[in-house]
Amino acid sequence: MAAKDVKFGNDARVKMLRGVNVLADAVKVTLGPKGRNVVLDKSFGAPTITKDGVSVAREIELEDKFENMGAQMVKEVASKANDAAGDGTTTATVLAQAIVNEGLKAVAAGMNPMDLKRGIDKAVLAAVEELKALSVPCSDSKAIAQVGTISANSDETVGKLIAEVDKVGKEGVITVEDGTGLEDELDVVEGMQFDRGYLSPYFINKPDTGAVELESPFILLADKKISNIREMLPVLEAVAKAGKPLVIIAEDVEGEALATLVVNTMRGIVKVAAVKAPGFGDRRKAMLQDIATLTGGTVISEEIGMELEKATLEDLGQAKRVVINKDTTTIIDGVGEESAIQGRVAQIRKQIEEATSDYDREKLQERVAKVAGGVAVIKVGAATEVEMKEKKARVDDALHATRAAVEEGVVAGGGVALVRVAAKLAGLTGQNEDQNVGIKVALRAMEAPLRQIVSNAGEEPSVVANNVKAGDGNYGYNAATEEYGNMIDFGILDPTKVTRSALQYAASVAGLMITTECMVTDLPKSDAPDLGAAGGMGGMGGMGGMM
């Protein structure tokens, strides 16, 4: 086992604090509308330019192992805030730095660290309740656009784009992709879309678009390969009599069956299109069941004793329209019952809660979106790859922030909400004097985000903080325009969830750091002695010394 280097008391805390400050100072320059960029070197390719706090934090590793431990603990604050709310990472880092610095000063002055931590925890619990009381619902697209704009570093075009995304609803899946031009674009897919196209180009009935478009078709869902046309004849005859088109979604349609369907389509006997079912294995079975729920049909599966020959029109699903191209199939307005669809969504949600891997969770979330919401794709436009990466990170932050805003509402932005909360809790007391100091440490730290935003804007933090504290309600300082007023009227909003998560995670990790008394790390390995000069002729295995 490697030898360890151990530091105690003030020695340990000073080293840890240095690491905290290095990381936090690098991250906090990005805060606010006038925050600066940070350039991150990459081992290959162009450097990354970012204004995203967590991206900066993730890049920082310090040479001194004790300092690095402090930096890594603050990195954890940023990561946790990012995981919980998808934004607010810089605010969380600034809060953590403020609590650690103030807290360690109190420890150095002789306060009991455990009581300090209890005081901080008490203040944060009370602050979370106050934040909830200040929160107002965020439902209209104007407020959503404002939240998106603030989170995307005051980029109004991104804010407006994200406000349009509410077309896919709360359950919708939103993906961010590289665009092809300089402008940002938004594609919204109505209905259920999956990534499987037609099995034969002969099904195409819209040559100008290269797509198959079928109005009010029946939809046959089969969890098996179909190669024998005899199995399908009863269904095909029933569909032909009904005078409607047919879409077949099966594990595969091949050989004689596919050839016969193509011939029937080309002769105009019955309009048919066949596609492979999406997914593989158990996921394919589940997705077929999703489509069945959406279209009011039944999956023909031999596992439950159903045979294709005995299928009737009652077993088929229906939709208002189906569009199939080379790579995708979109089912629009399935006729499934709303209660059945909601039941299916609830079932998938339960699976999301029980899922252990991020991959499974993501795939299940996509299924919820396809059944209940829709899919929106934001295509980010930029002139260079470096700009594209930076912009995608901002769009991603804005997306998470707007989701958080819809979930828990919004509070006044620009650090004002935390200043108001701190003022309301000024009379809060603990069980002893040391806990009272802990409460004051937390309340003083709540001013740090406002002070940092002002500092990044080139103004004097103390002057602005005092002016803001002299006001009440949503009165604050707009760093972008350098004027005071109602932050809600200015359109400067923060999602309550983002502010709450930032405060909770910052206090949690900072409290642990304040109560640290000892740090242990591996001693750096001393270089092994150079054995290249030892006796022995090359290739003689050390026998040279025997001659």
From Swiss-Prot:
GO biological process: protein refolding
Pfam families per record: Cpn60_TCP1
CDD domains: GroEL
Catalytic reactions on record: ATP + H2O + a folded polypeptide = ADP + phosphate + an unfolded polypeptide
UniProt KW DNA repair keyword: no
Uppermost EC category: isomerase
UniProt GO cellular component terms: cytoplasm
Main localization category: cytoplasm
Keywords: ATP-binding, Chaperone, Cytoplasm, Isomerase, Nucleotide-binding, Stress response
Domain of life, per lineage: Bacteria
Enzyme Commission number(s) from the entry: 5.6.1.7
Molecular function, one GO term: isomerase activity
Subcellular locations according to the entry: Cytoplasm
Keyword flag Cytoplasm: yes
Binding site residues for ATP: 30-33, 51, 87-91, 414, 478-480, 494
InterPro entries (alphabetical): Chaperonin_Cpn60_CS (IPR018370), Cpn60/GroEL (IPR001844), Cpn60/GroEL/TCP-1 (IPR002423), GroEL-like_apical_dom_sf (IPR027409), GROEL-like_equatorial_sf (IPR027413), TCP-1-like_intermed_sf (IPR027410)
PANTHER family in alphabetical order: 60 KDA HEAT SHOCK PROTEIN, MITOCHONDRIAL
Subunit text: Forms a cylinder of 14 subunits composed of two heptameric rings stacked back-to-back. Interacts with the co-chaperonin GroES.
Known function: Together with its co-chaperonin GroES, plays an essential role in assisting protein folding. The GroEL-GroES system forms a nano-cage that allows encapsulation of the non-native substrate proteins and provides a physical environment optimized to promote and accelerate protein folding.
Family (UniProt): Belongs to the chaperonin (HSP60) family.
Protein name: Chaperonin GroEL
Biological source species: Klebsiella pneumoniae
Source organism phylogeny: Bacteria, Pseudomonadati, Pseudomonadota, Gammaproteobacteria, Enterobacterales
Gene designation per UniProt: groEL
